[in-house]
């Protein structure tokens, strides 16, 4: 009877290590489509912010200058209002309007300073469209009553408490005021 030679042992060990390595690589690549990728969220947040600031809420001819009427209607229609025909979106869910999978959460908010010229120490606040005065006010202001036709310029679930969110910001002009369009994806 012939015993196992060193060469037989080496060939067996190489085959074993090769099979184990193949299994680990195959399982990792088979599972990767089901794991989240923060880089994908970054691309999504930037794409949504660009689409909103440059097209849906304004005009491609004048990007980052938001149409007051369509911007107000965008937030109002997602909270039960109707969509005007002249605006560049349809009456769908937020995710459908911005082209994001239902498996991702999206929050769109417009923040800014409504007290006067911005300074380095200002903290932007969430904005509200006051329908009776036809002007922007702080969402926390007593002049913002969403039950009487005023529109809170925020839509989507609140990301507070989420472990990881990706945020894209765009400097925009709304109703003659500087504001910041904030898109959060998680």
Residue ranges of model-derived segments:
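N-terminal single-pass transmembrane signal-anchor helix
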Residues: 1-27
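Long, compositionally biased, intrinsically disordered regions
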Residues: 27-186
């Amino acid at each position: 009877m012939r015993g196992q030679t060193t060469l037989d042992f080496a060939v067996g060990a190489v085959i074993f290590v090769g099979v184990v390595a193949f299994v680990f690589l195959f399982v990792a690549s088979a599972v990767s489509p089901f794991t989240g990728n923060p880089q994908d969220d970054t691309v999504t947040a930037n794409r949504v912010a660009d689409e909103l600031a440059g097209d849906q809420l304004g005009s491609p001819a004048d990007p980052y200058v938001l149409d007051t009427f369509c911007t107000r209607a965008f937030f109002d229609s997602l909270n039960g209002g109707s969509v005007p025909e002249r605006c560049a979106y349809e009456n769908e869910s937020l995710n459908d309007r911005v082209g994001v999978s239902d498996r991702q959460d999206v929050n769109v908010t417009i923040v800014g300073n409504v007290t006067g010229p911005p300074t380095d120490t200002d903290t932007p606040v969430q904005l509200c469209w006051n329908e009776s005065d036809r002007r922007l006010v702080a969402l926390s202001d007593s002049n913002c009553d969403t039950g009487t036709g005023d529109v809170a310029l925020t839509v989507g679930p609140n990301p507070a408490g989420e472990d990881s969110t990706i945020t894209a910001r765009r400097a925009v002009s709304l109703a003659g005021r500087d504001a910041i369009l904030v898109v959060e994806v998680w």
